[in-house]
Amino acid sequence: MINIDRFYKMKEYAPDLQIKEVSFGISKLYIINIQTVSSSELTNHFILDYLSKRSLIKNELISNLKNDIQYHIPSISFIEIKETDITEYLYNGFTVLIYKNEAIAFETKASLDRGVNEPSSEPTIKGPKDSFNENYNTNIGLVRKRLKTDSLHIKELTLGTKTKTKVSILYLNDIVDKELLDETITKIESIKSDKILDTYYIKSLISNENKSTFPSIKSTEKPDTISKSLTEGKICIISENSCNALIIPTFFIDYFYNDEDNYQKNIYIKFVKIIRIIALFITIFMPAIYLAIITYDQQILPTSLLINFSLQRASVPFPALIEAFILMFTFELLYEGDALTPSSRGTSLSILGALLLGDAAVNAGVVSPIMVIIVAVTAISSIFFVYYDFQSFIRYYRYSLMFLASFLGIVGVLFGFIFIITNLCSIKSFGKPFMITISPKLNIKSKKKLIKRGLMIQNTDKETLWKR
């Protein structure tokens, strides 16, 4: 007999637990569900339909609950479960029927998720405008809708001793790197944690980002990005209750690629990629180069420009480094405030704040006009990179280079540049070099091809390059 008393004890700390008793002769049938996660409409439809038909023979004993339900409601789908699994099924929105030593679970999960909306962090003008939401099945369905092939394999795991979160590993079996797949599965299966509430929990536990400032795993909320990555032989991770999926492995060049590039002309894509590369150098190196020149290497500037800069800074009471940090810190406040403020007001407040604060700071003699220009151009250049993780890397090295430039001048900037390149070339994303699509293993015949294309590697060539 299944112990019903423990469910009555559960009601002491789970007031949304509902238990109903129905008598059949000398025996009782128990209907148990959790009202907050199960649909009362579905529960009534399934259970009451069964009870209404059973009431005609109410005094007849039930010899086998499973067979009895199949006989009276042949169209209904259910699963026979063990006593030890009842609690887990209840928390997942199932309604459980218990009769003597039998337990039958009906899926009556309430719809607690939002619909498929436009992506919020990766806005797009051309191409699909759907995005993942917190519904696990919906997210997998959005990928299946795009990849109608038997080679799409899904390995499902359950992570988190407390949360029991379903996690899926998606890959195309005919093109995936088997070593990469085995390493990914091993790392995910080895996760020991009480809670997995989002894919970011998985990301922090399986990546090497604690040892490196560069994001080696990319997250996205766009199904078309996931589908494209799968066709390149990559692996994707989708988690229950998360609107972001992970892409493994991720390379440096991937952060210069935008999903809208798929729907643009080839010549335009090449031009925009050049702009993005220039923007990366500007947003990381421009403040440091200015500080190096204005502090130590004034001879680099033309005399007239140096005199102009000196006159602008004559009324500024702070060293150039402190002046730069005042403006950078103000920009960071505006950036974070814009991210946390509702979109209808955030942009207006940021523009208004930047204009008023910049003008007031120059008039008050706190900062020089050239420093305002430097910080403004740096901030605008960082907008080209929409991925928050990559922007964190940009911030880290921007401030580090500013310190080096303030103490060592241009030499410090060069040391910082060498360190960044060395660090980038030493990073691996799940055994694959982070810079592999820029400096791949090539035979003699393909070197000429790489020189011609440079960073303009076509999407169709990426897969073969990083697998070599």
Map each language-model feature to its residues.
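Amphipathic alpha-helical protein-protein interaction surfaces
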Residues: K148, A314, V366, G409-I410
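Hydrophobic alpha-helical transmembrane segments of membrane transport and translocation systems
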Residues: P369-M371, V375-R468
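Transmembrane alpha-helical segments that form the functional core of multipass membrane systems
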Residues: F251-Y399
